[in-house]
Structure formats: C-alpha cells, structure tokens
Amino acid sequence: MKLNDVTRGTGLEEHGIINANLIYWTPPTAVLYEQIVERGEGLVSHLGALAVKTGHYTGRAANEKFIVDEPTSRDHINWGKVNRPFDPEKFDSLYKRMTAYMHGKDLFIQDCFAGASPKHRLPIRVIAEKAWHSLFARNMFVKATAAELENHKPRFTVIDMPNFHAVPQIDGTNSETFIIINFAKRLVIIGGTSYAGEIKKSIFTVLNYLLPHHSKVMSMHCSANTGEKGDVAVFFGLSGTGKTTLSAAPNRSLIGDDEHGWDDDGVFNFEGGCYAKIINLSKESEPEIYETTRKFGTILENVAIDTISRRIDLNDDSFTENTRASYPITHIPNIVPSGMGGHPTNVIMLTCDAFGVLPPIARLTPEQAMYHFLSGYTAKVAGTEAGITEPQATFSTCFGAPFMALHPSVYAELLKAKIARHKVNCWLVNTGWSGGAYGVGSRMKIGYSRALVNAALDGTLAAGQFEKDSVFGLDIPRACPGVPGEVLNPRNVWADKAAYDATAKDLVEMFRKNFEQFKANVSQEVACVL
C-alpha cells in the first residue's frame, strides 16, 4: 500500500482480518495527530509533544509474555520463567477471537523495518487499534520509503489490541493481558495493555531469536556511539546504570540508544527512534533529551500535564516513575543518520553497584568480559515504602534477560568471538556508590564517570598503568585525568576497611551463586573468574 492510503475493510485478508472499517495505511505523523486528538486518545502539549496515558499498565507486563511452543522453534528457545510456553491450539483460538473483535473497527497500519542494516533488516507490520500506538511504531522503527512501501511484504506482524481481553480460563493466559510470540506464524499478538513499550520489546525479542539463530548476528541490549575518527563504543547496561546518559556525548555521534546488532560489517541500530525515561529530566543534566519533550512528534507517556495551559511537569510521578518519551532519533542532534557504524573499539559494561565495592572503572580480560556479560549485574535500592534500605543485587543475563529468547551462551559465544576477532577493549564501569554502600557512601559523580569513559575511549587509560584488585581480580587504572586518584580503588575511600572487605566478599558470593547456572556452558577460565 502507498503512504497514507485509506481502505474500507480491505487489504488485511492475509492476516485473517476481514470486515474492518477504515484501514489507515502508514499514515504520517500529522495525520496520526489529527486522529489521536479526534478520538480523545491524547492531548497536544505546549510546543507540540503528545501527552497520553497508558492506563493500568505503566510498564511491561513481564508475567503475561509467552512464546508459542511449536516445532520450528521449540528446540532453540531457552524455556523458563522468562520464555513461557503457550499452547498452539490456544493461540489459534485466541487469534480467531481477536480477528472477530476487529470487525467494524478502524485500524492503523505501519509498514516499516526493524534494523538499519539493509542486509539484516526485518520487514514488519504493526496493526493497531489506537492511533497513538501507530505513532509509537512510526517513531520507534525504521521508516520505509515511498518506493519500499509499494512492495512491502512483512516477515513479522504485530497485532496490538489494548481493549481486547483474554479469558484466562478459556485461553490459558495468566490474566486478561497477553503478549504472545508465534515464530511459526511470524506473528505477535498483544491484548489487555496500552503500554506501548510492549510493541518495541516484542520485536526486540523476535530479533534476539532470528538474528543470532539464523544469521549469526550478535543482538545486543545496548547503546552505541562513534567518535570523530570512526571508533565505535558499545554500552551494555540495565535500566538506571547510565547507558543513555554516558552514550550521549558532545564529541561523539549517537548510533542508537537501546538495541543493536553486530554483524560482519559492524554495529547497526535495530530502531529508528528512542524510548527514554524522563522522570525528573532537566534541561541542565540532559539538554538533548529534554528538548525532545518540546517537539512535535514526541509521545509523552504518563507525564503530568496541566489540561488548561497544556504545560507538562517532568518531575511529577503521580501516574508512575516510569514516565517515557518516544521520539524519532532525528529529534536528537549529533546522530549517525544511517544507524550503522564499524566494529567496536571498546565495549563498556555498566553497573550501578549500590554496595559500593566495585571500582569506578576496570579493564576486563576476554574471560572477565564473558563472566560479567553473562552475569548482567547491577544493584537496586528498594523504595522506602517497603521499609527496605539494604541494596538488592540484580542479575539479568546479557544485560537484558527478559528479551533473550535463546540460551545466554549463544549470545556469549557470539560476543566472545567478536571481541577476539576485532581485538576489542572491554571495560566495567560502576556508576553506583563510592565510599560505602547506599546509605553510607555517595553516588559516583557523573562527571567522574564521564571522565573515566572518555579516558577509556580515547586510549588514555590503556596507555597508563594498572593495579590488580585483590577481591574481584580486576585491573584498576592508577590515574585518570579529572578523577581524584583515591577514588579509583574503592577500598581506599571506605573509612571502615574491614566493612569494605566483608561487603566485597559478600558480593563475590552473590556472583558465584548466580553463575552456577552458566558453568556447564563456559570454559574453565570463564567459570573461575570469581
């Protein structure tokens, strides 16, 4: 179909969808704005961003995600708490009810691509009942040109119906909400949730299955940027570790902020947009992202808005702390328009260690890099409402466990091979606490973290001297421009050295306990890192 075509009930027969009312084919942003306002789905805020509410779900419904247990993918999926099996017959029955639900409804289609690389991009189609979800898909995925739309044949389709609910007793779901991926039918169905992030992350899960399994392309939950000389850096990290902040640097161009592939040519963005957390966002700390909240085309999820003045309050968490902005990457200055870069020179693994015992930066051997990649460690501090003040260790393998469909060892082996082949420098960066655990020490200054990352990327650290950390076996630099020397070794800034030793030992034990699950699939050298 052409850009902004409208048909009455025709064009979706291949998906089993007949008798829909108006079908809007890849409508542009301005048309979607008109539809969103007309249908009461959102408000246009001061300076043009669109404010919407997601209702009951203000984040991913992790317990409602399934993968259909069918012969083509059954033996490759890493089944467990994350990848739950779903009965094929139940899927077919649920899907038939969904298609019946769409009778007489207006639908919004976005035909686009997942992946910036022409070699590996996946043609996709997003069919949505909400106009703002169609705008979200338009923002987040790679847009097709007018010529490409003429012959667009989706290889995966997302059908997103927030107002359609499952019946758990009949459908075999856990609740009325569901996100189900069917690799045999190349289909994702979503119902019972208006949280748009489910669209993005379901396609990420699809790519995390297809690319490593079929094309030996490393799929990564990471940000990436490139320097003036073309040197690429990849930043792995869980939420809250500084992935977006540290990859946004004035002297480097952004390739992408969240999802990437690494093939024989280099790194490429999976997306055409960004989905940034914006709670307490300020113009001073994050000027580029702040400006996107004032731009036409940006979607502001669950952000407080004055309905009279239409001004937004980014500090208001009345609806959720997980307020988000979805915007095309072109809203950000200093980007790589192609979404592609060369092979990484540096890989940085970010952690926010609330125990305060990991160094602010350390050089990793290839074996240590594998260990920390498989561990995916960070630490969180629970909210005061729960009465918990002690840090809690979190391990999310490959820095993105909820989205990894294959066994973690598949991704680890791909990363190991690429690090070796391209002689990549690997670093562990702790953006968490220093001088003591949470409640005693203080958060690492962002200025120090930026200086350390810059020194790693420009070669300053590699050219200097290192000392061996006695607890974690890490190489710690002896000096870094712009960072006090005593900060570099975490033990030095703890007033109570015995407390440091005990806390560090406890964290080592947490690492070891978590890593037991991987020992059978790694070399002895990796298994014995800690």
Curated annotation (Swiss-Prot):
Q: SUPFAM superfamilies per the record?
A: PEP carboxykinase N-terminal domain (SSF68923), PEP carboxykinase-like (SSF53795)
| Protein's UniProt keywords contain Transmembrane | no
Q: Which residues bind Mn(2+)?
A: 201, 221, 258
Q: Does the keyword ATP-binding apply?
A: yes
Q: What are the record keywords, sorted?
A: ATP-binding, Cytoplasm, Decarboxylase, Gluconeogenesis, Lyase, Manganese, Metal-binding, Nucleotide-binding
Where does the UniProt entry say this protein principally localizes? cytoplasm
EC numbers, comma separated? 4.1.1.49
Offer one example of a GO biological process linked to this entry: gluconeogenesis
Q: In which pathway does it act?
A: Carbohydrate biosynthesis; gluconeogenesis
Report the subcellular localization: Cytoplasm
Q: What class of enzyme is it?
A: lyase
Q: Where does substrate bind?
A: 60, 195, 201, 324
The free-text cofactor remark is: Binds 1 Mn(2+) ion per subunit.
Q: Which reaction does it catalyse?
A: oxaloacetate + ATP = phosphoenolpyruvate + ADP + CO2
PROSITE patterns documented for this protein:
PEPCK_ATP
Q: Which cofactor does it need?
A: Mn(2+)
Any one GO MF term held by the record is: metal ion binding
**Tell me, what does this protein do in biology?**
Involved in the gluconeogenesis. Catalyzes the conversion of oxaloacetate (OAA) to phosphoenolpyruvate (PEP) through direct phosphoryl transfer between the nucleoside triphosphate and OAA.
What protein family does this chain belong to?
Answer: Belongs to the phosphoenolpyruvate carboxykinase (ATP) family.
Looking up NCBIfam families in the UniProt record yields:
pckA, PRK09344.1-2, PRK09344.1-3, PRK09344.1-4
- Identification of the protein by name: Phosphoenolpyruvate carboxykinase (ATP)
Give the species this sequence originates from.
Geotalea uraniireducens (strain Rf4)
